[in-house]
């Protein structure tokens, strides 16, 4: 895959107030290069079609920022769209002075001209921002667009793995490799759980030493797990870790029950927790789209995400509790407990993770969902993660959404959303909305 590149295209004509335009150009370059190291900028404003084409010959962008540095007619945008079809942000500069004198830039009319041409050429999902480079709202929107664009680019080189098949009745997480590739640019490969189990039992104790040390450092109370299960867990962790590294896997979904209890004798929960701490997005119950949701969240924040079921609603507190059996990344544990180790709540076999997740003033509940007609949509729920202890056996996080929690539950149940969600540590609503546009997906925001 080609190197990620964002191209800044300041288009205009030389008949407007060039001192004002030059000031806007210089401020824009400073802003864009401060927000991303991947932005390429021309040495000067592109004030003729010839200058535009010369610069277009020099670039190979995955993302475009078209700015009307002054008014420019539709030929500029048409030429750009003829050459490149990548996601685009159209940026209008605010008029610098309104004093009854000369119209300095006329950038807004240029935006209408560009947008009209882009729509006519089939591009109806470009992003748009209005304002000067120093305005906070403009900075925020451009930054969100750039971050979403980087994730969009990474998705097109992502290789996911489906380890085993979904259990009976969990088909919502089963993915077709062709659909993932077509919609997200993601490659999906499959491997049976049996293969990793067989690999796990083949290791020597010395070969597992590094994985054992990493687990002991991350977990609290692993030594209390029976030696047989502790050893089996470390071996399984090494098998997954080796497979991920050998095959360039960036995210995976894994079958868990009943196989790892009945055929292997030890759960995979804590293995997935360790992988999540290594920023390999890992979902249980073979939920490929859950793992994809986690991957997107991790790429936006650089942090592990929480994966779980919505299990409890408290109308008085306006909260929704998300829980799962024990796969949360150890680094998400509350500071006062650490990443405690326990046993699976149903099977009574360990090790699994046992803790409440740490609080966060900003959090986003997120899901890549597949509709019955085969199209995809995104659920986005901004809120915060409260300072709450473990709610049930396993791992949990209590989210207080900005929206009414009861309305969120009622609406999302009636809308047929899947029963697994990702809790992202951070407010990434705008980035997810920008990504939805880039992927041409429906986004449902609850706020």
From Swiss-Prot:
GO cellular component: cytoplasm
One of the record's GO molecular function terms: L-fucose isomerase activity
Keyword list, A-Z: Carbohydrate metabolism, Isomerase
Keyword Coiled coil in record: no
SUPFAM superfamilies given in the database record: FucI/AraA N-terminal and middle domains (SSF53743)
Enzyme Commission code(s) on record: 5.3.1.31
InterPro entries tied to this protein: Fucose_isomerase_N/cen_sf
GO biological-process terms attached to the record: monosaccharide metabolic process
EC category: isomerase
Catalytic activity: 6-sulfo-beta-D-quinovose = 6-deoxy-6-sulfo-D-fructose
Family under the similarity heading: Belongs to the SqvD family.
Purpose: Part of the sulfo-TK pathway, a D-sulfoquinovose degradation pathway that produces 2-hydroxyethane-1-sulfonate (isethionate). Catalyzes the isomerization of sulfoquinovose (SQ) to 6-deoxy-6-sulfo-D-fructose (SF).
Name of the protein: Sulfoquinovose isomerase
């Amino acid at each position: 895959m080609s190197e990620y590149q964002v191209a800044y295209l300041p288009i205009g004509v030389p008949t407007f107030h060039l001192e004002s335009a030059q000031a806007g150009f210089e401020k824009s370059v400073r802003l864009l290069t401060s927000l991303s190291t991947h932005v390429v900028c021309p040495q000067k404003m592109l004030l003729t079609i010839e200058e535009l084409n010369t610069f277009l010959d020099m670039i190979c962008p995955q993302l475009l920022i078209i700015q009307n540095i002054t008014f420019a007619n539709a030929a500029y945008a048409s030429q750009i769209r003829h050459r490149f079809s990548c996601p685009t942000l159209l940026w209008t500069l605010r008029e610098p002075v309104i004093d009854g004198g000369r119209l300095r830039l006329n950038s807004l009319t240029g935006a209408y001209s560009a947008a009209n041409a882009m729509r006519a050429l089939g591009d109806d999902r470009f992003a748009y921002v209005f304002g000067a480079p120093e305005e906070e709202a403009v900075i925020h929107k451009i930054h969100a667009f750039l971050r979403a664009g980087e994730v969009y680019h990474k998705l097109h080189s992502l290789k996911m793995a489906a380890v085993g098949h979904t259990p009976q009745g969990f088909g919502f997480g089963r993915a077709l490799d062709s659909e993932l590739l077509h919609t997200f640019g993601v490659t999906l490969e499959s491997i049976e759980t049996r293969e990793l189990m067989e690999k796990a039992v083949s290791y020597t104790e010395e070969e597992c030493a590094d994985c054992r040390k990493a687990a002991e450092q991350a977990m609290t109370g692993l030594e209390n797990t029976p030696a047989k299960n502790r050893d089996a867990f470390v071996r399984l962790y090494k098998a997954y870790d080796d497979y991920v590294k050998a095959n360039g896997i960036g995210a995976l979904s894994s079958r868990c029950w009943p196989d790892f209890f009945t055929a292997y004798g030890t759960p995979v929960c804590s293995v997935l927790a360790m992988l999540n701490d290594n920023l390999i997005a890992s979902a249980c119950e073979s939920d490929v789209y859950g793992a994809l949701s986690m991957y997107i969240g991790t790429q936006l924040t650089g942090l592990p995400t929480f994966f779980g079921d919505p299990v409890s609603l408290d109308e008085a507190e306006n909260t929704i509790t998300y829980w799962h059996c024990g796969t949360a990344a150890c680094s998400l544990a509350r500071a006062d407990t650490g990443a405690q180790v326990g046993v699976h709540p149903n099977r009574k076999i360990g090790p699994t993770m046992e803790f409440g997740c740490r609080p966060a003033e900003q959090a986003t509940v997120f899901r890549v969902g597949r509709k019955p007609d085969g199209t995809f949509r995104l659920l986005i729920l901004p809120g915060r993660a409260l300072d709450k202890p473990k709610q049930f056996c396993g791992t949990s996080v209590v989210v207080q959404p900005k929206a009414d929690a009861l309305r969120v539950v009622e609406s999302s149940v009636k809308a047929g959303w899947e029963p697994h969600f990702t809790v992202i540590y951070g407010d990434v609503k705008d980035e997810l909305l920008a990504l939805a546009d880039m992927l041409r997906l429906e986004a449902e925001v609850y706020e």
